[in-house]
């Protein structure tokens, strides 16, 4: 049996960081850190989640649909984060994230 993968760091990058100028430098530093540590970046929802909140309230969307929309908002913010680091690779599952991290990149 394969031993479980061990992460060194799990970093949640909150969506509020997307409202200032610190996001690009932060992602560049995380990219450098990925060469030394196995890390996983989990995105918040940012302005994408804000839009989902407004639209679901306005349209009176049910909670399950609103939840799925919020998850897609996190995906959108994750794509933005990935675009800010040359050492980042977009992944959509844990196995892919492990492979990317083992290669010294940011999943």
Q: Which residue ranges define each predicted feature?
A:
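Glycine-rich N-terminal segment of FAD-binding domains in flavoprotein oxidoreductases
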Residues: 44
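Short, active-site-adjacent cap segments at secondary-structure transitions
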Residues: 18-19, 47-50
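N-terminal glycine-/serine-/threonine-rich phosphate-binding loop
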Residues: 1-40
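Ligand-binding beta-strand-loop-alpha-helix segment within the catalytic cores
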Residues: 53-107
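Ubiquitous "structural anchor" signal
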Residues: 22-23, 52-54
């Amino acid at each position: 049996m394969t031993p479980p993968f061990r992460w060194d760091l799990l970093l949640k990058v909150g969506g509020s960081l997307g409202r200032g100028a610190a996001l690009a430098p932060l992602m560049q530093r995380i990219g450098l850190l990925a060469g030394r540590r196995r890390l996983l970046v989990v995105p918040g929802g940012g302005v994408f989640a804000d839009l989902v909140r407004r639209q679901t309230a306005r349209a009176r969307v049910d909670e399950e649909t609103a939840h799925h929309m919020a998850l897609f908002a996190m995906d959108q913010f994750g794509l933005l984060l990935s675009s800010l680091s040359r050492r980042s690779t977009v992944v959509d599952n844990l196995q892919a994230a492990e492979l990317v991290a083992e290669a010294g990149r940011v999943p």
